[in-house]
Protein backbone atom coordinates (compact mmCIF):
# COMPACT_ATOMS: atom_id res chain seq x y z
CA UNK A 1 0.00 0.00 0.00
CA UNK A 2 1.55 3.29 -1.08
CA UNK A 3 1.46 6.51 0.87
CA UNK A 4 -0.40 9.27 -0.93
CA UNK A 5 1.25 12.59 -1.71
CA UNK A 6 -0.98 14.28 0.85
CA UNK A 7 0.30 11.95 3.59
CA UNK A 8 3.97 12.54 2.82
CA UNK A 9 5.57 15.55 4.53
CA UNK A 10 7.04 18.06 2.11
CA UNK A 11 10.31 18.31 4.02
CA UNK A 12 11.92 15.70 6.26
CA UNK A 13 10.49 12.39 7.32
CA UNK A 14 7.37 11.55 9.29
CA UNK A 15 7.66 11.21 13.06
CA UNK A 16 8.00 7.51 13.92
CA UNK A 17 5.34 6.10 16.22
CA UNK A 18 7.49 4.56 18.96
CA UNK A 19 5.94 4.46 22.41
CA UNK A 20 8.55 5.39 24.98
CA UNK A 21 8.62 6.34 28.63
CA UNK A 22 8.85 10.04 29.27
CA UNK A 23 12.09 10.77 31.13
CA UNK A 24 11.47 12.56 34.40
CA UNK A 25 13.72 13.65 37.24
CA UNK A 26 12.82 10.72 39.55
CA UNK A 27 14.00 8.36 36.79
CA UNK A 28 17.44 9.99 36.87
CA UNK A 29 17.63 9.65 40.65
CA UNK A 30 16.70 5.98 40.38
CA UNK A 31 19.32 5.42 37.69
CA UNK A 32 21.98 6.81 40.03
CA UNK A 33 20.74 4.57 42.82
CA UNK A 34 20.89 1.58 40.47
CA UNK A 35 24.32 2.48 39.14
CA UNK A 36 22.92 2.93 35.62
CA UNK A 37 24.79 5.52 33.60
CA UNK A 38 23.20 7.69 30.95
CA UNK A 39 24.16 10.11 28.21
CA UNK A 40 23.12 13.70 27.63
CA UNK A 41 23.63 15.66 24.42
CA UNK A 42 23.06 19.21 23.38
CA UNK A 43 20.34 19.81 20.80
CA UNK A 44 19.24 22.99 19.08
CA UNK A 45 16.51 22.01 16.61
CA UNK A 46 13.62 19.65 15.93
CA UNK A 47 15.41 17.32 13.50
CA UNK A 48 18.50 16.60 15.60
CA UNK A 49 16.39 16.25 18.76
CA UNK A 50 14.22 13.64 17.04
CA UNK A 51 17.27 11.63 16.00
CA UNK A 52 18.77 11.79 19.49
CA UNK A 53 15.53 10.59 21.07
CA UNK A 54 15.42 7.70 18.59
CA UNK A 55 19.00 6.90 19.63
CA UNK A 56 17.89 6.61 23.26
CA UNK A 57 19.31 9.84 24.70
CA UNK A 58 17.11 10.57 27.76
CA UNK A 59 18.17 14.17 28.48
CA UNK A 60 18.76 16.96 25.95
CA UNK A 61 20.37 20.29 26.76
CA UNK A 62 19.57 23.37 24.74
CA UNK A 63 22.89 24.85 25.73
CA UNK A 64 24.20 28.35 25.50
CA UNK A 65 26.85 26.62 23.38
CA UNK A 66 24.38 27.49 20.63
CA UNK A 67 26.21 30.81 20.73
CA UNK A 68 29.17 29.03 19.13
CA UNK A 69 27.68 26.28 16.98
CA UNK A 70 24.43 27.95 15.86
CA UNK A 71 25.13 31.69 15.87
CA UNK A 72 28.90 31.71 15.37
CA UNK A 73 29.90 33.78 18.41
CA UNK A 74 33.40 33.30 19.81
CA UNK A 75 32.11 32.65 23.35
CA UNK A 76 28.80 31.85 25.03
CA UNK A 77 28.59 35.30 26.61
CA UNK A 78 26.62 37.18 23.87
CA UNK A 79 23.68 34.79 23.43
CA UNK A 80 20.28 35.96 24.71
CA UNK A 81 17.08 34.43 25.99
CA UNK A 82 15.30 35.56 22.84
CA UNK A 83 17.83 33.68 20.71
CA UNK A 84 17.52 30.47 22.74
CA UNK A 85 13.77 30.16 23.26
CA UNK A 86 12.94 29.29 19.61
CA UNK A 87 15.58 26.56 19.75
CA UNK A 88 14.02 25.13 22.92
CA UNK A 89 10.62 24.96 21.22
CA UNK A 90 12.02 22.93 18.36
CA UNK A 91 13.82 20.48 20.64
CA UNK A 92 10.75 19.93 22.81
CA UNK A 93 8.68 19.12 19.72
CA UNK A 94 11.34 16.85 18.28
CA UNK A 95 11.94 14.82 21.45
CA UNK A 96 8.64 14.54 23.33
CA UNK A 97 9.95 11.80 25.62
CA UNK A 98 13.25 13.44 26.57
CA UNK A 99 13.85 15.71 29.54
CA UNK A 100 14.72 19.03 27.89
CA UNK A 101 16.93 21.42 29.86
CA UNK A 102 17.51 25.04 28.81
CA UNK A 103 20.61 27.04 29.69
CA UNK A 104 20.13 30.39 31.38
CA UNK A 105 22.38 32.77 29.41
CA UNK A 106 25.02 35.00 30.94
CA UNK A 107 23.52 38.07 32.57
CA UNK A 108 20.08 36.59 33.20
CA UNK A 109 20.48 35.19 36.72
CA UNK A 110 23.64 36.44 38.43
CA UNK A 111 22.11 39.67 39.75
CA UNK A 112 19.44 38.18 41.99
CA UNK A 113 17.17 35.24 42.57
CA UNK A 114 14.26 37.27 41.20
CA UNK A 115 16.17 37.94 37.99
CA UNK A 116 16.82 34.20 37.65
CA UNK A 117 13.14 33.45 38.23
CA UNK A 118 12.09 35.85 35.49
CA UNK A 119 14.44 34.28 32.94
CA UNK A 120 13.66 30.70 33.93
CA UNK A 121 9.93 31.34 33.78
CA UNK A 122 10.26 32.49 30.17
CA UNK A 123 12.00 29.26 29.21
CA UNK A 124 9.30 27.19 30.89
CA UNK A 125 6.30 29.16 29.59
CA UNK A 126 7.49 30.29 26.16
CA UNK A 127 9.93 27.50 25.31
CA UNK A 128 8.30 24.51 26.96
CA UNK A 129 11.52 23.52 28.76
CA UNK A 130 11.26 21.00 31.57
CA UNK A 131 14.20 22.39 33.56
CA UNK A 132 16.90 25.06 33.41
CA UNK A 133 20.65 25.00 33.92
CA UNK A 134 22.78 27.73 35.45
CA UNK A 135 26.46 28.06 36.16
CA UNK A 136 28.04 28.49 39.57
CA UNK A 137 28.16 26.83 42.95
CA UNK A 138 27.77 28.55 46.30
CA UNK A 139 27.32 31.93 44.64
CA UNK A 140 24.06 30.85 42.94
CA UNK A 141 22.61 28.74 45.76
CA UNK A 142 19.99 31.40 46.50
CA UNK A 143 18.88 31.40 42.86
CA UNK A 144 18.62 27.61 42.80
CA UNK A 145 16.59 27.58 46.00
CA UNK A 146 14.08 30.13 44.72
CA UNK A 147 13.66 28.44 41.34
CA UNK A 148 13.15 25.06 42.96
CA UNK A 149 10.62 26.51 45.40
CA UNK A 150 8.78 28.01 42.43
CA UNK A 151 8.51 24.59 40.78
CA UNK A 152 11.33 25.02 38.26
CA UNK A 153 13.83 22.13 38.31
CA UNK A 154 17.47 23.22 38.20
CA UNK A 155 20.55 21.52 36.82
CA UNK A 156 23.66 23.14 38.30
CA UNK A 157 27.04 23.54 36.57
CA UNK A 158 30.34 23.75 38.46
CA UNK A 159 34.04 23.44 37.70
CA UNK A 160 34.91 25.26 34.51
CA UNK A 161 31.98 27.55 33.73
CA UNK A 162 32.21 28.89 30.16
CA UNK A 163 30.26 32.06 30.92
CA UNK A 164 33.08 33.03 33.31
CA UNK A 165 35.85 32.39 30.79
CA UNK A 166 37.12 35.96 31.09
CA UNK A 167 37.38 35.74 34.88
CA UNK A 168 38.93 32.28 34.84
CA UNK A 169 41.64 33.35 32.40
CA UNK A 170 40.71 30.98 29.61
CA UNK A 171 39.78 27.32 29.33
CA UNK A 172 41.44 25.85 32.40
CA UNK A 173 40.91 22.73 34.50
CA UNK A 174 39.25 23.61 37.81
CA UNK A 175 39.56 21.93 41.20
CA UNK A 176 43.28 21.32 41.32
CA UNK A 177 45.21 21.94 44.53
CA UNK A 178 43.38 24.25 46.91
CA UNK A 179 40.55 24.51 44.38
CA UNK A 180 39.40 20.99 45.25
CA UNK A 181 37.84 22.10 48.53
CA UNK A 182 35.92 24.88 46.80
CA UNK A 183 34.59 22.52 44.15
CA UNK A 184 33.36 20.10 46.79
CA UNK A 185 31.75 22.99 48.66
CA UNK A 186 30.07 24.13 45.45
CA UNK A 187 28.72 20.64 44.77
CA UNK A 188 27.27 20.32 48.25
CA UNK A 189 25.81 23.83 48.09
CA UNK A 190 23.88 23.25 44.86
CA UNK A 191 22.56 19.93 46.13
CA UNK A 192 21.39 21.48 49.39
CA UNK A 193 19.79 24.35 47.46
CA UNK A 194 17.63 21.86 45.57
CA UNK A 195 19.39 21.18 42.25
CA UNK A 196 18.32 17.83 40.78
CA UNK A 197 21.72 17.24 39.12
CA UNK A 198 25.06 18.94 38.58
CA UNK A 199 27.35 19.22 35.58
CA UNK A 200 31.07 19.12 36.36
CA UNK A 201 33.24 20.49 33.57
CA UNK A 202 37.02 20.15 33.23
CA UNK A 203 37.53 18.71 36.70
CA UNK A 204 40.22 16.15 37.64
CA UNK A 205 38.78 12.65 37.31
CA UNK A 206 39.64 11.57 40.85
CA UNK A 207 37.96 14.64 42.34
CA UNK A 208 34.88 14.21 40.15
CA UNK A 209 34.57 10.62 41.32
CA UNK A 210 34.85 11.75 44.93
CA UNK A 211 32.07 14.31 44.41
CA UNK A 212 29.89 11.74 42.64
CA UNK A 213 30.13 9.37 45.58
CA UNK A 214 29.46 12.15 48.06
CA UNK A 215 26.30 13.52 46.39
CA UNK A 216 22.86 11.94 46.25
CA UNK A 217 21.99 13.79 43.03
CA UNK A 218 23.35 12.67 39.64
CA UNK A 219 26.62 14.15 38.42
CA UNK A 220 27.12 14.81 34.72
CA UNK A 221 30.67 14.96 33.46
CA UNK A 222 32.24 16.81 30.58
CA UNK A 223 35.97 16.47 30.86
CA UNK A 224 35.51 15.08 34.38
CA UNK A 225 36.55 11.47 33.97
CA UNK A 226 34.62 8.18 33.85
CA UNK A 227 33.14 8.05 37.35
CA UNK A 228 30.31 10.56 36.93
CA UNK A 229 26.76 9.24 36.78
CA UNK A 230 26.30 10.63 33.25
CA UNK A 231 28.24 12.30 30.47
CA UNK A 232 27.44 15.23 28.18
CA UNK A 233 28.95 16.49 24.94
CA UNK A 234 28.07 19.13 22.40
CA UNK A 235 26.52 17.06 19.63
CA UNK A 236 28.53 18.68 16.85
CA UNK A 237 31.74 17.67 18.64
CA UNK A 238 30.46 14.17 19.36
CA UNK A 239 29.40 13.51 15.75
CA UNK A 240 32.38 15.11 14.01
CA UNK A 241 30.32 17.91 12.54
CA UNK A 242 32.73 20.64 13.57
CA UNK A 243 36.16 21.00 12.02
CA UNK A 244 39.47 21.89 13.58
CA UNK A 245 40.92 21.10 16.99
CA UNK A 246 38.58 19.93 19.75
CA UNK A 247 39.01 19.80 23.52
CA UNK A 248 40.90 16.88 25.05
CA UNK A 249 37.70 15.50 26.56
CA UNK A 250 35.93 15.21 23.19
CA UNK A 251 35.69 11.88 21.40
CA UNK A 252 34.32 11.90 17.88
CA UNK A 253 31.85 9.09 17.31
CA UNK A 254 31.20 9.97 13.67
CA UNK A 255 32.28 12.12 10.74
CA UNK A 256 29.04 13.91 9.93
CA UNK A 257 30.87 17.01 8.75
CA UNK A 258 32.75 15.17 6.02
CA UNK A 259 29.63 13.27 4.98
CA UNK A 260 27.51 16.40 4.79
CA UNK A 261 30.18 18.26 2.84
CA UNK A 262 30.42 15.37 0.36
CA UNK A 263 26.64 15.14 0.02
CA UNK A 264 26.32 18.87 -0.65
CA UNK A 265 29.10 18.71 -3.24
CA UNK A 266 27.46 15.73 -4.99
CA UNK A 267 24.10 17.52 -5.04
CA UNK A 268 25.62 20.68 -6.48
CA UNK A 269 27.47 18.67 -9.13
CA UNK A 270 24.30 16.88 -10.29
CA UNK A 271 22.43 20.17 -10.49
CA UNK A 272 25.20 21.69 -12.60
CA UNK A 273 25.29 18.62 -14.85
CA UNK A 274 21.52 18.55 -15.24
CA UNK A 275 21.18 15.01 -13.88
CA UNK A 276 19.12 16.12 -10.89
CA UNK A 277 16.19 16.18 -10.79
CA UNK A 278 15.65 13.10 -12.95
CA UNK A 279 12.37 11.50 -14.06
CA UNK A 280 12.03 9.67 -10.74
CA UNK A 281 12.01 13.01 -8.89
CA UNK A 282 9.61 14.78 -11.25
CA UNK A 283 5.80 14.81 -11.33
From Swiss-Prot:
Names of required cofactors: Mg(2+)
Alphabetical keyword list: Cytoplasm, Magnesium, Metal-binding, Pantothenate biosynthesis, Transferase
Range of residues in the leader sequence: none
Broad enzyme group: transferase
The EC number(s) this enzyme carries: 2.1.2.11
Residues at which 3-methyl-2-oxobutanoate binds: 64-65, 103, 133
One Gene Ontology biological process: pantothenate biosynthetic process
InterPro entries the record matches: Pantoate_hydroxy_MeTrfase, Pyrv/PenolPyrv_kinase-like_dom, Pyrv_kinase-like_dom_sf
Primary location recorded for the protein, binned into one broad class: cytoplasm
Chain sites annotated for binding Mg(2+): 64, 103, 135
GO CC list: cytoplasm
Record region (Disordered): 1-24
Active-site residues, Swiss-Prot/TrEMBL: 201 (proton acceptor)
Protein location: Cytoplasm
Keyword Lyase: no
Any one GO molecular function term: 3-methyl-2-oxobutanoate hydroxymethyltransferase activity
Catalytic activity: 3-methyl-2-oxobutanoate + (6R)-5,10-methylene-5,6,7,8-tetrahydrofolate + H2O = 2-dehydropantoate + (6S)-5,6,7,8-tetrahydrofolate
HAMAP family found in the cross-reference section: PanB
Family: Belongs to the PanB family.
Full protein name: 3-methyl-2-oxobutanoate hydroxymethyltransferase
Organism: Nocardia farcinica (strain IFM 10152)
Amino acid sequence: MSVSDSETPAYGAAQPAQPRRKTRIPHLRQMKADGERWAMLTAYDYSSARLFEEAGIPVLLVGDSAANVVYGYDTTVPITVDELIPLVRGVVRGAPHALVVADLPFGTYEGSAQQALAAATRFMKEGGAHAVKLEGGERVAEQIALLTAAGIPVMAHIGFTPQSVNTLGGFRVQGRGDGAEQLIADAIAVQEAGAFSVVMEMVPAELAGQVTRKLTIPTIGIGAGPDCDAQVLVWQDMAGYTSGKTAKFVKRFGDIGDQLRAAAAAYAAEVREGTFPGPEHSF
